[in-house]
Swiss-Prot record:
UniProt-listed InterPro entries: dGTP_triP_hydro_central_sf, dGTPase, dGTPase-like, dNTPase_1, HD/PDEase_dom, HD_domain, PHydrolase_assoc_dom
Record flagged with keyword Ubl conjugation: no
Cited function: dGTPase preferentially hydrolyzes dGTP over the other canonical NTPs.
UniProt protein name: Deoxyguanosinetriphosphate triphosphohydrolase
EC number(s) on file: 3.1.5.1
GO biological process annotation, one example: dGTP catabolic process
């Protein structure tokens, strides 16, 4: 496997720092320890403790938040990374693959990507995501604005983004921005958060590891079959496009390819949440362990002694009877289920990484590590199917998701007057911190966080010298991003309380 040299991928350069060099192993390790400190101490990580995993607004601390889920993903990611490196050592490939000074960074990058992987998710999880997209899609009408010429079906409600006769280049930009704003995605928001909002100045390698999908949010062309998995969701926004281009150059990544260690982070997430969602459902009394076993065995089909289901799920269930009366049988069942599952799936993920190393290294491997015809992947899929059928469709979960959708939609309605302001008026409001003719908008602006307001101001300053028509389009884009940034950064409880306060429901 010539051409595989991880020194080409594990870059310790940072976007806001001068180029640096680190020769010995400890110096290189220190660079990535700095990344760890920046990430662990960031407000985005702390906010995960009050963001939904499955059950919004949950008061039972035993039920997972995004933070506790991310800690579990971090542990599994570390395990997979160690398994891969151990196999490289056994095959005497460490030096051949350029890893002799990069063993600790290899693990650290994976661990921190696992910890960060959900930081871009809005309140109320995927329903919060859907609320943002639906709200902006209704106003942007992205499909009505495809192409470079106006269409009679165009229903865009934003004057500056409507397509105009004879303005081909501006219309292409308008269409791109309408698509971009209608494609809010947690993974893309994570890239924006660490680079544009928090300015953590992480190494390119560390950020590359959370670039899970490789399609820009504004993409409207057909997706090439060679990358239909890697491009199935937006991975970054137009606002971060230049940064992502820098990142790709620094990490030697082709346009739609992935960073190799991202596959490990993705596998760790798949392994962790498939068990966690079921355990939380038992904690919430949605079903019992016995009912869960029945659901899983029905999905598996005929169980034979010694097959993977019997070794993993059956063995954990048999342990249930032995522990009865001595300790919490439910806790013991899930401990054994987790140990058995991780013990089978982690080596399988590591083996898949190694078997497909050339494509994984280049980033063109167009599937997840845990996506094949093996029994291990079948087991993972039955966990997911049981969760979809019996957890996500449960009335309590659906009721909370509907509430979350309404909260996020309502907050967007409340803050929409800021988007309706003329560009000159909003610019004056930002500069003076008040506008006499817009008292409601002034008070809404004051509620936005300083961090998000500064990010908007910096973006507006960068585009200041553009021709006026382009400036107005980009200014609206960054203003809409400002509102998305603020609302998506809320915790579940803060969003719920803010909605009630502003609706005078208290």
């Amino acid at each position: 496997m010539s051409g595989i040299d991880f020194k080409q991928k594990i870059s310790f350069q940072r976007p806001f720092s001068k180029p640096s060099s680190a020769e010995d192993e400890y110096e290189i390790t220190r660079v990535f320890e700095s990344d760890r400190g920046r990430i662990v101490n960031s407000a985005a990580i702390r906010r995960l403790q009050q963001k939904t995993q499955v059950f919004p607004l949950e008061r039972n601390a035993a039920v997972r938040s995004r933070l506790t889920h991310s800690l579990e993903v971090q542990q599994v990611g570390r395990y997979i990374a160690k398994e891969i490196l151990n196999r490289f050592k056994q095959d005497k490939k460490i030096t051949a693959y350029g890893l002799d000074k990069l063993l600790d960074p290899f693990e650290s990058i994976v661990e921190m990507a696992c910890l960060m992987h959900d930081i871009g998710n809005p309140p109320f999880g995927h329903f919060g995501e859907s609320a943002i997209n639906d709200w902006f899609t209704k106003r942007m009408d992205p499909n009505g604005g495809s192409g470079s010429e106006p269409q009679s079906t165009d229903q865009c409600q934003v004057e500056v983004l409507k397509l105009c006769e004879g303005e081909t280049e501006l219309n292409i930009l308008r269409s791109k921005i309408r698509h971009d704003l209608s494609q809010f995605e947690g993974n893309a928001q994570a890239i924006r958060l660490v680079h544009s909002l928090l300015k953590l100045n992480l190494t390119y390698a560390q950020v590359g590891c959370i670039l899970k999908y490789t399609k820009p949010a504004y993409w409207s062309a057909p997706i090439p079959a060679s990358h239909n998995y890697l491009m199935k969701k937006p991975g970054f926004y137009l606002a971060e496009e230049n940064y992502v281009k820098e990142l790709r150059r620094e990490l030697n990544m082709e346009e739609f390819d992935r960073f190799p260690l991202t596959y490990i982070m993705e596998a760790a997430d798949d392994i962790s949440y498939c068990i966690a969602d079921l355990e939380d459902a038992v904690e919430k009394n949605i079903f019992s362990v016995e009912q869960l076993y029945d659901h899983m065995s029905q999905e598996w089909g005929a169980v034979t002694p010694g097959d993977l289901f019997d070794k993993v799920v059956g063995a954990a269930f048999r342990q249930l009877g032995r522990e009865q009366g001595r300790r919490s049988s439910e806790d013991q069942f899930f401990m054994y289920l987790r140990v058995n599952t991780v013990g089978k799936l982690v080596p399988h993920a590591a083996q898949r990484f190694i078997e497909n190393l050339p494509a994984v290294f280049s980033g063109s491997f167009n599937q997840a590590l845990l996506e094949d015809s093996s029994a291990a992947c079948k087991l993972l899929q039955i966990f997911k199917r049981v969760a979809v059928k019996h957890v996500f469709n449960h009335p309590e979960v659906e009721q909370l998701e509907l509430q979350g959708y309404r909260v996020i939609s309502g907050l967007l309605d409340i803050y929409s007057p800021l988007l309706a302001m003329p560009e000159t008026a909003f610019t004056q409001l930002v500069a003076d911190d008040r506008h006499r003719k817009y008292p409601i908008e002034t008070r809404l602006f004051h509620k936005l966080s300083i961090k998000h307001r500064l990010a908007y101001a910096e973006s507006a300053e960068r585009i200041r010298n553009l021709p006026s028509e382009q400036y107005e389009i980009y200014e609206y884009y960054y203003r809409a991003r400002l509102i998305q940034d603020y609302i998506s950064g809320m915790t579940d409880l803060y969003a719920y309380d803010e909605y009630r306060r502003l609706m005078a429901a208290e």
